[in-house]
């Protein structure tokens, strides 16, 4: 009975939040209210409000406010600062003419490709490769928004389609050393090499190709439906005094991430890399003019870009975090886990149930990690009791948690991309919906075809 009540409360609040956001209310305000309401109900029901890693203040009422403080400090100080730095960097690149120079140079070879959608798919594959270097979905999204998004929009790709491309790459896991993959390999009782490269990678590649094809047709359909016209930017209209080599500057953060990964050079945080990139750009600006006042004035543009990012993106991330914690403390996720364990032992049925529940949990909470970490704990027990190969259950769940995050209007990556693109999170979700569902179907089918369903098939008995 309690499980049903917790599910009902979660669903009612989710529907209410979605309704008001769709009606045009501030997403930040609506998510804050929804999250606080869930936390208050959780406290009344006697649930612990704060995560187990945080000490209680002694009172449930102050614990609720304490959690908001925790999010403000964590998301405003680490993830939030990274987002603000990237937005400030993007604003500075526009100010000094570097983005205009990228468009001028890129437009020359691209003029031979008549379809902006082919350019969009090329950008998608590049973005997927970037996920190997940047493991954070939100971090990758904001990095792509600061670098690839302006280029895509300026060569004729609609803002919605370009935002969807920036939000999509982390939907399918490629990085073999990410925390999710390491945990999944342990749950599957396989070595990391066998699990990541021999089992998961072929499925991931198939899903990425399928999602790319789906993006091509879905974005084109939506653009036609919404009467969005594509006009390749006339580069002759772009006037900039920036030298041609400035075209490399917007991509220096990506280059820095690849170089300073601990293999080729020291391992540096993305914020450190961004500071280096800003210093390089400002020094080049000084060498062009030898006008210190002009350089300092130009940097003010970057600071204002950072301030806009705090208001439009970081606070939205904090609100989304409060909402996700509310769903967790009310028992919504645990209730979904209880439903999964109530199903029978047929491998395909159990796999589909786990995939659907993981996907729903990821969509509602906006987290890819939390649902997977919660569900994966029971995989070894379920697999052994049912005679099912653990990897057969783990791989689809692993991908479903990340795919579901891309369908969530409260996930960090969707919120960040929408905020930087200045469109609704629901617009991003609509743009990613069909490609994500195509990717999910491919993952399920590929798992059924490529991964043995029973433990006996694995051991050869």
Swiss-Prot record:
For this protein, the record's InterPro entries field holds:
C4_dicarb_anaerob_car, C4_dicarb_anaerob_car-like
Could you give one GO CC term from the UniProt record? plasma membrane
State what induces this protein.
Expressed only under anaerobic conditions. Anaerobic induction depends mainly on the transcriptional regulator FNR. Nitrate and fumarate cause slight repression and stimulation of expression, respectively. The expression is not subject to glucose repression.
Protein localization: Cell inner membrane
Supply the source organism's classification: Bacteria, Pseudomonadati, Pseudomonadota, Gammaproteobacteria, Enterobacterales
- Asked if Ribosomal protein is a keyword of the record, the answer is no
Give one GO term, molecular function aspect: succinate:fumarate antiporter activity
Loss of this gene results in the following: Inactivation of the gene increases fumarate-succinate exchange and fumarate uptake by DcuA and DcuB, suggesting a preferential function of DcuC in succinate efflux during glucose fermentation. The triple mutant dcuA-dcuB-dcuC is completely devoid of C4-dicarboxylate transport (exchange and uptake) during anaerobic growth, and the bacteria are no longer capable of growth by fumarate respiration.
Task: Kindly give the membrane topology term recorded for this protein.
Answer: Multi-pass membrane protein
Principal place of residence: membrane
Q: Name one GO biological process term.
A: C4-dicarboxylate transport
Superkingdom, natural source: Bacteria
**What is the annotated role of this protein in its UniProt record?**
Responsible for the transport of C4-dicarboxylates during anaerobic growth. Catalyzes the uptake of fumarate coupled to the export of succinate. Can also catalyze the uptake of fumarate and the efflux of succinate, without exchange. Shows low rates of transport, which are sufficient for succinate export during fermentation but not for fumarate-succinate exchange in fumarate respiration, indicating that it may function in vivo as the succinate efflux carrier for glucose fermentation, even if it is also able to operate as a fumarate-succinate antiporter.
Which reactions is this enzyme annotated as catalysing?
Answer: fumarate(in) + succinate(out) = fumarate(out) + succinate(in); fumarate(out) + 3 H(+)(out) = fumarate(in) + 3 H(+)(in)
Q: Which Pfam families match?
A: DcuC
Record entry for activity regulation = Active under anaerobic conditions.
Q: Does the keyword Nucleotide-binding apply?
A: no
Q: Which UniProt keywords apply?
A: Antiport, Cell inner membrane, Cell membrane, Membrane, Symport, Transmembrane, Transmembrane helix, Transport
Q: Where are the transmembrane segments?
A: 2-22, 26-46, 79-99, 116-136, 137-157, 164-184, 199-219, 240-260, 267-287, 313-333, 343-363, 436-456
Q: Which family does it belong to?
A: Belongs to the DcuC/DcuD transporter (TC 2.A.61) family.
- Specify the protein name: Anaerobic C4-dicarboxylate transporter DcuC
């Amino acid at each position: 009975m309690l499980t049903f009540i917790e599910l009902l409360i979660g669903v009612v609040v989710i529907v209410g939040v979605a309704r008001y956001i769709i009606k045009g209310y501030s997403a930040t305000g609506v998510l804050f209210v929804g999250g606080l309401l869930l936390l208050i109900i959780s406290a009344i029901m006697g649930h612990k409000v704060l995560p187990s890693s945080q000490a209680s203040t002694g009172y449930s009422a102050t614990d609720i406010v304490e959690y908001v403080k925790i999010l403000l400090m964590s998301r405003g100080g680490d993830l939030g600062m990274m987002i603000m730095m990237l937005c400030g960097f993007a604003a500075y690149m526009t100010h000094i003419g570097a983005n205009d120079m990228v468009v001028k140079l890129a437009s020359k070879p691209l003029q031979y490709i008549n379809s902006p959608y082919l350019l969009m798919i090329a950008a998608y594959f590049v973005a997927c490769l970037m996920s190997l270097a940047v493991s954070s979905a939100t971090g990758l999204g904001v990095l792509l928004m600061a670098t690839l998004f302006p280029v895509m929009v300026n060569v004729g790709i609609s803002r919605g389609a370009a935002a969807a491309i920036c939000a999509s790459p982390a939907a399918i896991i490629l990085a073999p050393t990410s925390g999710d993959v390491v945990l999944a390999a342990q749950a599957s009782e396989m070595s990391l090499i066998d699990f990541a490269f021999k089992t998961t990678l072929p499925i991931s590649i198939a899903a990425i190709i399928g999602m790319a094809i789906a993006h091509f047709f879905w974005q084109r359909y939506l653009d036609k439906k919404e009467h969005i016209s594509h006009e390749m930017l006339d580069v002759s209209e772009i006037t900039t005094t920036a030298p041609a080599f400035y075209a490399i500057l917007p991509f220096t953060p990506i280059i820095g991430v690849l170089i300073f990964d601990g293999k080729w050079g020291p391992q540096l945080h993305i914020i450190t890399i961004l500071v280096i990139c800003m210093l390089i750009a400002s020094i080049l600006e000084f060498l062009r003019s030898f006008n210190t006042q002009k350089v300092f004035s130009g940097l003010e543009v970057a600071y204002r870009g950072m301030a806009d990012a705090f208001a439009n993106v970081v606070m939205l991330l904090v609100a989304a975090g409060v909402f996700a914690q509310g769903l967790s403390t009310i028992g919504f996720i645990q209730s979904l886990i209880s439903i999964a364990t109530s199903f029978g032992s047929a491998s395909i049925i159990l796999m589909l149930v786990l995939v659907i529940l993981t996907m729903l949990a990821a969509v509602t909470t906006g987290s890819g990690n939390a649902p997977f970490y919660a569900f994966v704990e029971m995989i070894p027990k379920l697999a052994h009791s049912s005679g099912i190969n653990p990897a057969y259950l783990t791989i689809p769940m692993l991908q479903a948690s990340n795919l579901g995050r891309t369908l969530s209007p409260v996930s960090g990556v969707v919120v960040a991309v929408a905020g930087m693109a200045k469109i609704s999170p629901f617009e991003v979700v609509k743009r990613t919906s069909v490609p994500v569902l195509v990717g999910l179907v491919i993952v399920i089918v590929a798992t059924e075809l490529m991964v043995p369903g029973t433990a006996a098939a694995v051991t050869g008995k």
